[in-house]
A protein has these predicted regions:
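Periplasmic/ER-lumenal interhelical loops and adjacent helix-loop junctions
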Residues: 40, 235, 241-316, 324-325, ...
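Membrane-interface coil-to-helix junctions
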Residues: 18-115, 144, 157-158, 277-281
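Membrane-embedded helix bundles of polyisoprenyl
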Residues: 110, 114-123, 127, 131-177, ...
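Signature aromatic-anchored transmembrane alpha helix within multi-pass, membrane-resident enzymes
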Residues: 333-334, 379-383, 415, 421-449
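Extracytoplasmic
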Residues: 438-520, 532
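Membrane-interface helix-loop-helix junctions at transmembrane boundaries of multi-pass membrane enzymes
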Residues: 222-232, 309-349, 363-387, 391
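Start-transfer (signal-anchor) and selected internal transmembrane alpha helices
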Residues: 1-30, 230-239, 327-330, 373-383
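Perimembrane helix-loop-helix junctions
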Residues: 204-240, 316-319
Length: 576
């Protein structure tokens, strides 16, 4: 009977996830040839990365892309094209050829919702909850606002909707906390998946992986140096494999040097951001918090989730129930993650100075580790805290300034609250969770309008890549490559679309990471070629309308081998 109830809970979660997907996003985005909703900001970058990768023969490293963002090239990682899925699609195209370009973002969103529900259900069932309360708690996780916010913000980022990886990692942590069980194979699979989806999700997963690893090391009765070498010996094989995978997928494909880290989350964790509704709340109670942009962290959890966390925390630990008390370590570790990985901590919209934030990280990290394991001497704790803080600050803005690590705290807080309520309420847990689900649904109703406006409807006639007759008539004869001259952020999207349609290399364009020194040298050389009219055969240059170009425009026009076409906000410079 219990197996039947579990099967019904699984079917219920899958049905709810599919229904929510249809209501919020619509089945129209599952059409692989429907691309009209992707041609903006980060989604466009991932779309172009995937399709340029499909155009090229597979070469080493597997995730590298040479014809997109020329002359340096890029990779699946730095276009956020979900490397594992892109490789799967490329293998599928080899076996069963199909027309490209295509998009997989719609299917990725659906898979994320389904796995979010399944991993949430698995977590609660694994911790001894009955199927019905596990099902109800999973519904809140599927409708988690911070998850769906990734699809409707000003620059959508569908790759980061893989929150199921955080839930899977938290489930493994709970397995260690309650049963002292460490499944190395499960962790290895999880880390391998996350490194081939997105760097942020990998770091979050790896951070949670360190909890049982470090705690097991601390429990050994040996010297600090002996513990360190044992830890190094046990973890080196997995770290070596992950490093090899990172190389294969293109993590190191972009040259080092003066590289931009933009696109990897220049955000801060605001301590009240979990109350910031961003207009998603139906209660109106948190409207005064609106306007705290770029402070992700919790985002807004929803009134149902906030109430459940409040009720769970107010019930207090149960006497003589050590596992419940031990579970407090999870939100403590989440706090460590926030303060150790964010140098910009906000309070009511005001960001603390980097130095003060670093001191706060150091103190909280020491206090948290001492709280978890009082047997630790102060010296190694301070050493660990100082080393972590120093390394993170040396890593630059890629990690230290992101408030997205607050996602861990949001999930950990809710999970801890549900497990706490299980012991307090017992049979009354299901009615209470049902009430919280209804409150959550009522509060988040305005979110529907935000999402619906961002996604295409099934009755829209236009779905593929837009044609551009003006570019078609200008590009004669057909060029061999297209170069873009201008500022860092200058990228004419219609030109990149045209280049993809005609299988032409294009670049350089703005991507999350590029070598500024190499780009600057390339731009200077390109500018000299523009002034002298020295275009190579089959080359087209899209030049941004800058003051410098306007001053020298007549000089460029005098070159007999060059013709200039005004495209509105840029010039096309072509050979005659």
């Amino acid at each position: 009977m219990r197996t039947l109830h579990r099967s019904m809970a699984v079917c219920g979660v899958l049905a709810f996830s599919t229904w929510l997907f249809s209501v919020l996003y619509g089945f129209a985005i599952l059409d692989p040839h429907r691309m009209d909703w992707l041609l903006q900001e980060d989604p466009a970058q991932a779309f172009f990365g995937l399709n340029y990768f499909l155009l090229e023969p597979l070469h080493w490293p597997w995730g590298s892309i040479s014809t997109f963002n020329i002359p340096t090239g890029t990779s699946l990682v730095f276009t956020d094209a979900i490397p594992w899925l892109s490789l799967l699609v490329k293998c599928g195209k080899t076996l069963i050829p199909f027309d490209s370009p295509i998009q997989i973002s719609g299917w990725w969103i659906l898979v994320c919702l389904l796995l979010q529900g399944l991993f949430g259900l698995r977590l609660f069932l694994r911790e001894g909850l009955a199927p019905l309360p596990s099902f109800l708690a999973s519904l809140i996780l599927v409708a988690w606002p911070a998850l769906h916010f990734r699809s409707i913000e000003e620059t959508p980022h569908y790759t980061l909707m893989g929150h199921f990886l955080i839930l899977a990692a938290l489930s493994c942590v709970l397995d260690w906390v309650f049963r002292h069980r460490f499944n190395r194979i499960e962790w290895a699979i999880l880390l391998t998946l996350s490194i081939g989806i997105h760097f942020y999700l990998f770091v979050m997963t790896f951070l949670l992986y360190t909890i049982p690893i470090l705690e097991a090391s601390w429990e050994r009765e040996s010297s600090l140096s002996h513990r360190f070498f044992q830890l190094l010996r046990s973890e080196t094989p997995l770290l070596a494999i992950l490093g090899g995978l990172a190389y294969c997928l293109g993590y190191f494909e972009v040259p080092a040097g003066d590289s931009s880290s933009a696109g990897f989350g220049l955000f801060s964790m605001d301590l009240i951001s979990f109350l910031n509704s961003e207009g998603f709340s139906g209660t109106g109670a948190f409207e005064f918090m609106r306007g705290l942009k770029s402070r992700e962290g919790f985002q807004y959890l929803g009134l149902g989730a906030i109430l459940s966390i409040g009720i769970g925390l107010s019930s207090g630990p149960i006497r003589n129930l050590r596992p419940t008390i031990m579970a407090i370590r999870i939100p403590v570790i989440a706090f460590i993650a926030i303060f150790a990985l964010s140098s910009r901590i906000g309070i009511f919209g005001h960001t603390l100075p980097v130095f003060l934030s670093g001191v706060l990280e150091f103190v909280l990290f020491c206090m948290a580790l001492r709280r978890m394991n009082p047997s630790l001497s102060l010296l190694p704790v301070m050493f660990l805290a100082g080393a972590l803080t120093g390394l993170v600050h040396l890593a630059g803005p890629t990690l230290r300034s992101s408030g997205r690590f607050g996602w861990i705290l949001g999930y950990a807080g809710f999970i801890f609250a549900v497990l706490q309520l299980r012991h307090r309420l017992q049979r009354a847990l299901s009615p209470v969770l049902l009430g919280l689900v209804l409150i959550q649904a009522w509060d988040l109703a305005p979110l529907l309008d935000h999402v619906k406006r961002a996604f295409p409807k099934s009755d829209m006639s236009h779905s593929g890549l837009p044609s551009n007759p003006q570019l078609d008539s200008s590009m004669h004869p057909k060029p061999l490559r297209i170069l873009i001259y201008g500022s860092e952020y200058f990228t004419p999207p219609e030109l990149v679309v045209w280049a993809l349609q005609h299988h032409l290399p294009v670049g350089p364009i703005y991507l999350p990471r590029f070598d500024r020194n190499r780009r600057q040298a390339f731009m200077e050389a390109l500018w000299q070629r523009i002034l002298k009219g020295r275009l190579m055969a089959g080359e087209v240059i899209a030049a941004e309308k800058t003051e410098e170009l306007r001053e020298h425009l007549e000089e460029v026009r005098k070159n007999p081998g060059v013709r200039i076409k005004d495209m509105g906000h840029y010039y096309l410079i072509l050979t005659r």
